[in-house]
Amino acid sequence: MEEDDICIQNAAWNKLYRRELMGELRFPTGKYYEDIVYTTMLLARSQKTVYLDLALYNYVLEREGSIMGEGLGSRLFTDQIPAYEEKEAFLRSIGREDLADVHRYFFYKRLLLYYIALGKSQKDMKEKYRRVIRERLLTDRGEMDRVYACRAANPKEKKKMEIFLKSPKLYLAVIRVNERFLIPVKQRLRRH
């Protein structure tokens, strides 16, 4: 079955590639989150991809030295966010505005999740990086309608973003109410 709407994760560990496809393309050394751009460039070269909805590999997240277990840290902002921006620029450079907007939509969702998660960080880190996220989203405000009109977008996510842009404090309060009260009630109702 051919399916253009399957969202493929950036991770390199869950893919097999033909060597010829890689050509001269290599992972950059000394960079974290390098698979975000690398995987996108590699998939853009491919004439055919096959997706198996089958677990054939057991990835260990808590591996010593793995950045997957680091949680929120400065690398997210110094390496990961720039990698997402580079990925989007690449998608636009090859004429895939549609995919660039889908990517941006998921990027915005991720930034809102980071904003919430930063609540558990040390005060100086929390304030610094929440400010970075807030400024980025306010800067992008003019592009929100286009991005949230992409094929992958959920209208509820746009509402969350609108609340955040009006007041990050209100956004956090709404999320807390949702997590503490609304989600548990919905889960109980589904069980009955």
Write out the residue ranges for each language-model feature.
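Donor-binding/catalytic cores of nucleotide-activated saccharide
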Residues: 1-52, 57-75
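Short charge-dense sequence patches
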Residues: 28-40, 80-85, 170-174
